[in-house]
Amino acid sequence: MIIDLHTHSNASDGTDSPSQLIANAIDAGIDILALTDHDTIAGWQEAEAALVSHPKGASLKLVLGSEISCQDRDGTSIHMLGLLFDPNFEPLMQEMEKTRENRLTRMERIVARLNESGIEITMAEVYSQKRDDATLGRPHLADALVARGHIANRDEAFATYLHNGSKFYINHYSPSPIDAIRLIKAAGGVSIIAHPLASRSGRKVEPEIFTELIEAGLDGIEVNHRDNAEDEKSLLLEIARQHNLVVTGSSDYHGTGKMNRLAEFTTSPEEWERLESRARERRVISK
């Protein structure tokens, strides 16, 4: 059984539409797929409709969720995957909306910094790289820089201008990971910290933070991810085992926006069963 619990569509910063993502997952032989766009559930309805209408849709089960942007006390970026939560739980929906709104003002400030350094780009060009209801993010700015000819591709844009240590980087409002976990749990869902050490992408949290996250109700750790180095995977696996947390592996697929391939890392059926059992209700979508 092939289980991929972390993917993105163009409802945030992926390049596949939710329908295309479903079709690609079916073609890839995936059995269980989670759609986890950044701070939004905008792609849920289309993904579910695509699954039901696809002639081979019975081969795939769909897990709906979101990757929620968070920051710890030191401003370190932490991403929390929320799965199987109730989309009608207003406190969680309001928090994600607040984060999305703040992304707009943040993007305006990043664009201004680029312009001040002689890198010409406009907000209109950034907006042209996303669909109307998509969550605005740095990948859209990266695509605009590529289209303008400033850079060759998304990866180069992040390596040169948009990484967290860049002089152009600006934090945006987002909840603490503890608050995000509590909201996900209150909405009946399960929470997984995404690529938590991720030294290969420049994002790294201190292992000590796990104590607070576990106390808040953390359900799992995304251990197997291309941005976690091998020694980091070993450390994360040890933490998960010590605290009886679910171990997941995921692609973090973004379509053509990143090198990540669907199901390049996966979650075992046994760990998925443990994770799903922690949700308040069964919310997996099937044809």
Where are these regions (language model features)?
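An N-terminally biased module of ancient metal coordination in phosphate/nucleic-acid-related enzymes
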Residues: M1-S77, L162-H163, P175-K258, T267, ...
